[in-house]
Amino acid sequence: VTFKFPVGPSKGRCNICGQDTDLTENHVPPKAWAQGIALRVSSVADAISGEKKPRSHKMPNGVCFRSICRTCNGSVLSRYDKALVSMSREVTEILRDRSKVTYYQSIRIQPQLVARGVLGHMSSVGLNRYEERHSQHLFDDRSDLLRQVRLHYWVYPYSGRTVLRDFGLCVLGGKGSSAVYVLKAYPLAFAMVWNREFQFEDWQPRSFDSFAGFEPDQEASLPLEFVGLPGQVWPEHVQGSTIALLHSDGAFVAKEKRRG
């Protein structure tokens, strides 16, 4: 499938509240996360097809869906967006100063809001994809989201963006499987794992588990690691005993346009 962005009709069912209404564009990740980068967006199925020039679409600011209403895009997500963008900017500032890039660093974040920012933007991926389990956490900032999912994070020092909603991993031999939402864009990556018992086969990123009991606006010190990071295509490029499942309607990659 080749998509034309922004994907979605001007009217339809909002992916967050479920109401049939006018729909607005939502960038994944938030537009303020990384602005002014010309990209070519393609479905993961096209990107891994083996073609030298997989089908893609020009997009100035990444993956953009017209799938949520103005109210949800504004009053519901804006607070979460601010926390998510603030986190990305703090990491960017560290990466810009080589003297700060040590084995270990920490930043201040609002983990409950950041987690909902990730969920909110992943909820906007795809058309007519309302899920009550998503909306309950987005409309209630005191819900038990971080006890229902395990939100992994890591520093992502690569270009391009990866957005995977319709994605799952299974480790063969009865070692578990899970639906996994993946959002990667310089300088951060997140993997929201819906089966908290699931363990990646080769590497375990840090998670938000210790913040599950935090208040919505409560701040925390978040540790960052800059060594031993996985490659650009982890975890979707599987090896060993892990297999990956995905559907192209909810799995996209965006690469910087080549100059010249």
What are these regions (language model features)?
Residues V1-D81:
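An N-terminal structural lobe/cap that precedes and organizes the functional/catalytic core
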Residues V1-V7, S56-R133:
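Catalytic cores of phosphodiester-bond-cleaving enzymes
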Residues C14-C17, V118, L183, F190-M192:
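Generic structural hydrophobic/aromatic packing signal, biased to beta-strands
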Residues I37-V41, T92-R96, D141:
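Short amphipathic alpha-helical patches
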Residues S42-A45, S88-E90, D202, S210-G213:
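Short, low-complexity, polar/charged sequence segments that are solvent-exposed and flexible
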Residues A47-P54, D97-V101, G168, S210-A212:
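Low-complexity, polar-biased intrinsically disordered regions enriched in Pro/Ser/Thr/Gly
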Residues G50-E51, N61, Y103-R108, D217-Q232:
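Low-complexity, flexible helical/coil segments
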Residues E131-G260:
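C-terminal, charged low-complexity interaction regions
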